[in-house]
């Protein structure tokens, strides 16, 4: 068995894929986190807002929803200056969700591409940040029924999904790599 299943205390489990194989899974309450972090905000962050959050060192720490995710003991909160206004709140939340998603994918054993579906598939800055943080191609699904479509593709033995467009362009934001390293160090301390 892979050592991925031995990572205790990180909210991981084994699911089963459509072919009956064990699939490592890491999870967190991303939708709930987003709701709590962006309450009263409308829209999505711009890349310039994300760059401002990086340069100001505004961090959202894991643990908004206690007891779950890769840092279940963390207590959440802000590190550094709190965000000023809706734009910085949205940008901070976008970075946080991308970092948490990257962490979960790394724990579970990331593949060679990421396919986004659901509400975050409509958030281009999130997709572009995730691509930059993981170094993996990120595709956005235009299909609202990804699970059913995936099952059909397996049944038909199709090797690709025609509803996937080209991979998003990873962001190239000054300081993103250092920001991510700092966030990971802070998150590990909170574990």
PLM segments and residue spans:
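Active-site core segments that coordinate phosphate-bearing ligands/cofactors
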Residues: 2-115, 122-191
